[in-house]
Amino acid sequence: MKTYCDSSFDDRRGIAGIGVTIVDGEKRRTYSSWIRARSNNEGELFAIHLASILSEGRGIIYTDSQCALSYIRGDVKDKPRTREQYINHKYCEYWAKQIKRRGIATEKIKAHQKGFDVHSMGNRIADLLANEGRAKFYARQ
């Protein structure tokens, strides 16, 4: 099973569109929605967390967010300078711990590739679903 996830952040409104696509053989499931978020990194981490739930902890979750993977692996060395950065950092750490607790494998893939291989297509679909998630927020307005 391969799961691709992405986030599309709107800084002005403080929301992130979330997109997840799960490929299991010939079957494909998709999900798009939005969440309140302080940063794109929080959105990316939430997308990975949601993907781990939707895929029931099976297979590998692919993301194009190096920062999210750094949080999951505990490699983030940045020191928050402002109160807002500190709060964002703590939320990102929270989601990273939730992902680690589920014990699912995560891997990095390149973003915005133009090829027709499985990974680029999966990532592009997740990206499109994340944008659709943002559109769902805008449609509520």
Predicted regions and their residues:
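RNase H-like nuclease fold core
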Residues: 1-42, 46, 50-57, 73, ...
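RNase H catalytic domain
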Residues: 4-15, 50-124
